[in-house]
Amino acid sequence: ATVLTALDAALGDFDQRSVFRYLRSALSGVDYDTCDRLENYAFLWDIRGNRWLSDWKNHPDGLGNDWTEEAKSRLELLDQERRRLMEPLEQLRQGFRDASSLNSQVEALYQFLERVGMEQRLEAMAQELDETGSNRESQILNQLWEILMSALEQMYDVLGQTHWEPEHFVR
């Protein structure tokens, strides 16, 4: 599901709903508090589209609030987190825009998965499940990366140079 939410966010031009669906997914690497702060700022300042890619400069508490050192620090941390999260999504979006074939789209998605450390996140989640006695769920997560890579390889090999509209890739 995380892969689909990332594709929705990137190919949907970063509308708030799809971005937060991705950020709230278990594999995005964003903790709940950070996600809440990003979401509050985005709603407060109506962040959508390319505004996700621009530096955030508005007060984290809204208009009329004093710029204290604490507020500046919070904004700086929010903006750093925004950059960390949005750079891979922007590269994914650009990879799909530049793609002339399904192969190029598969490569863009694979590069995104590598950038965000998806394989390592799946392994860490599987280890946590294993440690809590959820062996079956752990095994499923351990297999997920291989299944995803196999599916992408098959798409690459079979459909290769086929022209494919980005929005069809998600379906």
Task: Give names to the regions the model predicted.
Residues A1-R171:
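Polyanion-engaging groove/track-forming segments
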